[in-house]
Amino acid sequence: MGFIYARKLLLCMAVSIYAIGSTTTTETTTSSSSTSGSGQSTSSGTTNSSSSPTTSPPTTSSSPPTSTHTSSPSTANAQKHAGHHRGRAGGRRGSPQGGSHTTPHPDRLTPSPDDTYDDDTNHPNGRNNSIEIVPQLPPDRPIIELGVATLRKNFMEASCTVETNSDLAIFWKIGKPSVDAFNRGTTHTRLMRNGVPVYALVSTLRVPWLNVIPLTKITCAACPTNLVAGDGVDLNSCTTKSTTIPCPGQQRTHIFFSAKGDRAVCITSELVSQPTITWSVGSDRLRNDGFSQTWYGIQPGVCGILRSEVRIHRTTWRFGSTSKDYLCEVSASDSKTSDYKVLPNAHSTSNFALVAATTLTVTILCLLCCLYCMLTRPRASVY
């Protein structure tokens, strides 16, 4: 009897050991499958516990040590596949979440799985990498550029550009009085300085030329906003830029002849100072007493004007004789550069004698023809 009971007890123990081994194999396979799913989800851009090592439930000491690996070949493949996904997903060591943070970057179209992003703006892959860094200029030393030009021949337009990041107010002065009453505007913009964008304040002043005297000093002042506008502004507390208003146009010389053909007039405009003038008639150069000249000084809207006049002496017209050319040369000194220059020469031809002689000849011929017709007209017989 005791032998029978011992045999039954051994059989029960064998069945129990077989049951425990099957349970361990099933749990290990389930854990490996979940590990493979975790690796796949990590590569798609989510953070989970795939980077932690895969563990299986503890087994009893009575189970064979190789039952976990030999019970199912899919378990080893699942673990190998999960390890492969963990290697692709990457991740920084010591990361609190264990995996890589692959959230799409706002400045990129598609995220790279091998890049790691953080919120550090100094990092090359930081989120603020696309923002242009504008250098900060000293608020007390702005850079000013001033230019003056002519707009549509009737307006003087001045432009003042101030490179600054501070809140400044721009004031204009022509001579001593301010010009706040005229049309002006201020805009904020960005300019490129040596390939670097900088903030700038641009003020534009537009004044009719009739209200401006050329060669007057114009000043652009960039002042703090707490100063009072107008004549009360202390320019010592501002950053200023000044220049001289140029003439509205370019210097020009023209020769005009009177309707009777007895005078040649040379007019030179847009002069800074009174020039010297010389006349040449054909190959002969006239002396200073051979012509007269009048100087008109600088006035609002115009620079100096020189008018010179030469008397044309009539000569007996002969067929085939060449007409005389009148040459007016004006040499002006530039007060700003102290450079003498010869203005473009103006040529004109006097053909009034030829026209008058031709007209007189045609008239005489017409009269002779009429007289001949009257004399040769047959007379009627009177009975």
From Swiss-Prot:
Glycosylation sites: 48, 128
GO (cellular component) term, any one: virion membrane
Signal peptide residue numbers: 1-25
Region described as Disordered: 24-136
Compositionally biased residues, Basic residues: 81-91
Pfam families xrefs: Herpes_gp2
Keyword Transmembrane: yes
Protein's GO biological process: viral process
Disulfide-linked positions: none
Segments crossing the lipid bilayer: 354-371
Places the protein is found: Virion membrane
Bias-annotated ranges (Low complexity): 24-75
Keywords for the protein's UniProt record, in alphabetical order: Glycoprotein, Membrane, Signal, Transmembrane, Transmembrane helix, Virion
Keyword Transport among record annotations: no
Topology relative to the membrane: Single-pass membrane protein
Described function: The glycoprotein gp2 from the avirulent strain Kentucky A (KyA) is probably non functional since this strain harbors an in-frame deletion of 1,242 nucleotides in gene 71.
Name of the protein in its database record: Glycoprotein gp2
Organism: Equine herpesvirus 1 (strain Kentucky A)
